[in-house]
A protein has these predicted regions:
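Residue-level detector of anion-binding/catalytic polar loops
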Residues: 40-41, 74, 118, 160, ...
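Short hydrophobic interaction/assembly module
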Residues: 61-83, 87
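Active-site-proximal loop/turn and secondary-structure-junction residues that shape catalytic pockets
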Residues: 21-23, 46-48, 81-84, 126-128, ...
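Histidine-acidic metal/acid-base catalytic patches
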Residues: 2-38, 65, 69, 116, ...
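Glycine-rich, proline-tolerant flexible connector loops at the mouths of alpha/beta enzymes
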Residues: 45-65, 124, 131
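Active-site acidic/histidine proton-transfer and metal-coordination neighborhood
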Residues: 28-29, 67-70, 87-193, 203
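Residue-level preference for long, well-ordered alpha-helices that form the structural scaffold
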Residues: 53, 57-60, 94-101, 135-139, ...
Length: 287
């Protein structure tokens, strides 16, 4: 890629952060703080708003959007879609549960649209693990059935649903980008996309994270950045220089969201160090 194209890609990449880091903070204060630290977007975990997204009124969703816009901050979308819920399962043999799960994903997509978001990240490992007696092939059939039914409506809403491969330590279904892409190809809907994640892709054994980015990021719908130590970029041993260089070289021009799991350094300090690391890496990627 030429230097001018790399600069264009960097200019298009926007930096966001996931809101669950700001535990028990007022939503307005989260938005103001995130914006003051230099982020352009906020990615929301539904469980931080209500036990279920359907518990929120239309008025409350519109209010949250207005609060973000006043910051000013974009709502990127939703992630941790099924976390801390009960009764939903993607790969269960029970057709009624699969239908209920699909219906809830549609409700999440509608909430994303109202919030002004553009994507949802489907990780939720505990709602896709293989149940006893269910094979990988059967799980693929069940998941494909759910997505084939709901993706036309999600697409009409203008929302991308991004499938997140996760490490074998987290789930036994969809562990690699290649596996996720096979399911995406099977469903064959333009709004069903791959999600990439530094921690998750670090568990893949056949290629490095930069190599996986080179291979898969051109068609990816979203990207999460964190260290394998569960803290933010720049707070561990992961070198984000090659990662962001590969991302820029791939032509990826979407959001990069900071997603962390170890909150102990504090929300503001984590957010501050993370964006500083990502900006340094992006600046270096165009030199």
């Amino acid at each position: 890629m030429s230097a001018s194209r790399r600069k264009e890609s960097v200019a298009m990449i926007r930096l966001g952060i996931c809101n669950e880091l700001f535990e028990n903070w007022d939503f307005r204060q989260v938005c103001r703080t995130v914006r003051a630290l230099g982020y352009d977007g906020l990615e929301i975990a539904p469980f931080t708003l209500a036990p279920r997204i359907t518990d929120l009124t239309l008025g409350r969703l519109r209010e949250l959007r207005s609060i973000a816009e006043d910051a000013p901050l974009s709502v990127i979308g939703l992630h941790w879609l099924l976390a801390k819920t009960e009764g939903f399962y993607l790969t269960t043999p029970d057709a009624s549960v699969r239908r209920k799960t699909g219906d809830y994903l549609l409700a999440l997509a509608e909430a994303t649209r109202i919030l002004g978001g553009e994507l949802m990240v489907l990780g939720s490992p505990k709602q896709r693990d293989l149940l006893p007696g269910v094979t990988q092939e059967q799980a693929g059939d069940y998941a494909a059935e759910v997505f084939t039914r709901i993706m036309p409506e999600i697409g009409r809403m203008g929302i991308d649903l991004c499938l997140e491969p996760l490490a074998p330590s987290e789930t036994n279904y969809l562990n690699t980008c290649a596996q996720a892409n096979r399911l995406i190809a099977r469903v064959n809907h333009p709004n069903l996309k791959l999600h990439m994640d530094v921690k998750a892709q670090s568990s893949e054994t056949e290629a490095t994270v930069p190599e996986l980015i080179t291979r898969y990021a051109p068609a990816a719908g979203h990207f999460h950045a964190q260290d394998v130590n569960l803290r933010g970029p720049g707070m561990g041993d992961v070198d984000f220089g090659p990662i962001l260089k590969a991302l820029v070289a791939s032509g990826y021009d979407r959001w990069v969201s900071v997603e962390v799991f170890d909150f102990s350094p504090g929300a503001e300090e984590t957010a501050r160090q993370s964006i500083a690391c990502l900006r340094r890496a992006l600046d270096a990627a165009v030199r």
